[in-house]
């Protein structure tokens, strides 16, 4: 015991001996390392897979600032967090796209209904125009029919009757005592002439002709 203490004091008191011991501790020989238990007690470290993380900024960050034995766990947790963020963002994006798709479908349905109604109106207008065109073509192709003999006789009789009745009315208004003064062949001729000029339709002209002729007869 005393000898050990003396040897310890001798080692501490000798600077050269301390330097030699320090060198052995820093760079021990295999035998010294086995004796000292350095290799047996060395802390195990977790190595990153070869090639993994090459060019990856996340793993480059971990390699630089995180202890090697905790890099794998940190990398795993960080990637899980990134996946959660992506999934959350994906859910929001999916919901937004579904809402936009529903709105677009509703707008498209409304546009299609409006287009169908517009097409229906357009077809109705086109059908009306085609009908009018066909009617105009049909009417334009018809030739005017002339009056037959019976119609001519009837028109003449009606025209003369109107003119003759008008002449009698004038006679009554003028209080002529003898209606025969205006009911002469000249009055009838005037009525027939007016009917000829008016193509059997102008009763106004017949009336004017008869009145003019009747007044002329009355002033004689």
Curated annotation (Swiss-Prot):
Pfam family, any one: Rhabdo_M1
Keyword field: Chaperone, Host cytoplasm, Phosphoprotein, Viral RNA replication, Virion
Location of this chain's protein in the cell: Virion; Host cytoplasm
Post-translational modification remark: Phosphorylated by host kinases.
Subunit composition and interactions: Homotrimer when phosphorylated. This trimer is stabilized by binding to the L protein. Binds soluble protein N, and ribonucleocapsid.
Function, as annotated: Non catalytic polymerase cofactor and regulatory protein that plays a role in viral transcription and replication. Stabilizes the RNA polymerase L to the N-RNA template and binds the soluble protein N, preventing it from encapsidating non-genomic RNA.
Protein name as it appears in the record: Phosphoprotein
Taxonomic classification: Viruses, Riboviria, Orthornavirae, Negarnaviricota, Haploviricotina
Gene: P
């Amino acid at each position: 015991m005393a000898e050990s203490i003396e040897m310890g004091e001798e080692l501490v008191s000798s600077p050269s001996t301390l330097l030699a011991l320090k060198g052995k501790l820093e760079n021990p020989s295999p035998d010294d390392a086995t004796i000292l238990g350095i290799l047996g007690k060395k802390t195990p470290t977790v190595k990153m897979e070869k090639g993994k993380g090459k060019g990856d900024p996340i793993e480059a960050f971990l390699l630089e600032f995180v202890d090697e034995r905790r890099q794998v766990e940190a990398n795993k947790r960080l990637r899980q967090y990134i996946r959660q963020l992506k999934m959350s963002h994906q859910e929001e994006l999916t919901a937004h796209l579904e809402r936009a798709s529903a709105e677009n479908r509703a707008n498209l349905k409304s546009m299609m209904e409006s287009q169908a109604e517009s097409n229906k109106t357009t077809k109705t207008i086109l059908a009306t125009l085609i009908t009018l065109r066909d009617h105009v073509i049909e009417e334009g192709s018809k030739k005017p029919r002339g009056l037959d003999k019976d119609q001519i006789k009837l028109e003449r009789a009606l025209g003369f009757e109107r003119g003759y009745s008008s002449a009698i009315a004038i006679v009554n208004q003028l209080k002529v005592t003898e209606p025969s003064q205006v009911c002469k062949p000249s009055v009838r001729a005037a009525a027939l002439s007016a009917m000829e000029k008016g193509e059997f339709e102008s009763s106004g002209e017949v009336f004017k002709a008869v009145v003019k002729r009747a007044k002329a007869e009355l002033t004689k």
